[in-house]
């Protein structure tokens, strides 16, 4: 199974130590329910990776780990075949020992859009909710974050993350836990909390915003990115069934409605930093994700609409601060 003992050792010495009251039991229960099935086969793939100590780790401008010269051509081909077993790769891209993992999403584009708007991450404790395979977590570390924790219940994302971490000399300041936000206690320990591409999957968006708030220190920063529609503060789309072929889509507010929701939950200095149409250059099928992608989700005769007739995907980036309680 995945070994979480290094994470326990790390947080025992930092501001997350109080999490040890509940976390080991949670993850022990998770392990007991994931002994069989696809996870076991993915872990066998992880165990086949060569042990290589690399001196080349680039996280500031991209996620590039290891050099192509550290492996023979045969070893490179074998590693590429192993990495392909974690198909589909959704978020990236990654370069591992010269192997370019061309993921479905150009997550680096999103990072480039949001980076100018957020507070510097240097020395910060960061939580990434719904982190996927962890691409943005590596970029957070590249910006100098002291400790980065990602949570995502997907077994595949966990194994993809562990694959990258294996070649990053088993980095001990970036960790992914297979949990949902609803499984976290009120830690109140992170300087920055990211939630990107999660809110529209929640039946109760207000509860999600409050759960994010509970993880922040007072004065901490929320970075929230979600699908939005046009309109004023009263505009909210509730898809009848699917949206862009996606199940489990509940609420798509306007950017102004989103701002109002976050303010209503008690955040301060709430602002919409960016609104961006998702284009097929940013989300597309590749050799590392051969399933349908954005092009297949849009009306072929009108790309401004989804196949269901709703407005095409548009994403807003919201930044807010958790209020500091006044001294009594």
From Swiss-Prot:
SUPFAM superfamilies: S-adenosyl-L-methionine-dependent methyltransferases
Reaction(s) catalysed (UniProt annotation): carboxy-S-adenosyl-L-methionine + 5-hydroxyuridine(34) in tRNA = 5-carboxymethoxyuridine(34) in tRNA + S-adenosyl-L-homocysteine + H(+)
Record's signal peptide: none
Gene3D superfamilies: Vaccinia Virus protein VP39
Keywords: Transferase, tRNA processing
GO terms under biological process: tRNA wobble uridine modification
Record-linked Pfam families: Methyltransf_9 (PF08003)
Its job: Catalyzes carboxymethyl transfer from carboxy-S-adenosyl-L-methionine (Cx-SAM) to 5-hydroxyuridine (ho5U) to form 5-carboxymethoxyuridine (cmo5U) at position 34 in tRNAs.
Protein family: Belongs to the class I-like SAM-binding methyltransferase superfamily. CmoB family.
Subunit structure, as described in the record: Homotetramer.
Name of the featured protein: tRNA U34 carboxymethyltransferase
Source organism (scientific name): Psychromonas ingrahamii (strain DSM 17664 / CCUG 51855 / 37)
Gene: cmoB
